[in-house]
Design a protein with these regions (language model features):
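Non-catalytic, mostly N-terminal accessory regions of nucleic-acid modification and defense proteins
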Residues: 1-167
């Protein structure tokens, strides 16, 4: 998620810089209206530059907290909870101090070469696609009961193509 929002944010920043001929104030205002705001220390690339730090777990936790704060309306729950607060990249579950840094560095190294900006992806809805993937796997792993409520996108598309809708027609799921 962090790599995706960082790449999209950087791409938008480059677009606005070109559009507004380097006027930083206009670029800043335009970026504030984007889907997500990515503070500098929350950027994937900031973390990547610091990937060998013995405090990389704490840095990732801080980056996610700052990202939540900058996007409170989108990433905060209605009850005031935040989606990343229960994730701890500094947890002893990741191993001893050296092992933890190694694992997190490897994770950052694996994501670094991927370009996840909108112009490089087949679909702009990466988050929706990931969510649909998780729901589909939950439905198939949970048996028929959970699967009763999930219709794969391919089935929906096929049904839409097979039905010849007429003006005023309605389709119900």
């Amino acid at each position: 998620f962090l790599k995706y929002v960082t790449d999209v944010y950087i791409e938008k920043k480059e677009e606005y810089t070109k559009k507004y001929e380097g006027n930083e104030e206009r670029v800043k205002r335009a970026l504030e209206r984007e889907r997500f705001i990515v503070p500098e220390e929350s950027s994937f690339y900031f973390l990547y530059e610091n990937r060998s730090s013995p405090k990389i777990g704490e840095m990732i936790n801080h980056a996610l907290a700052e990202l939540e704060e900058a996007n409170r309306e989108k990433l905060g729950g209605h009850d005031g909870s935040n989606i990343f607060r229960n994730i701890d990249f500094n947890s002893s579950n990741l191993g001893d101090a050296k092992g933890k840094v190694t694992r997190l560095r490897t994770l950052l190294n694996d994501f670094y070469p991927l370009i996840l900006s909108s112009s490089h992806l087949e679909s702009n809805d990466v988050i929706g696609g990931a969510y649909e993937f998780l729901i589909a796997n939950f439905a198939s792993d949970s048996g028929k009961k959970a699967g009763e409520f999930f219709t794969p996108a391919e089935v929906s598309t096929l049904l839409a193509k097979l039905t010849k809708s007429k003006s005023g027609s309605r389709i119900y799921d």
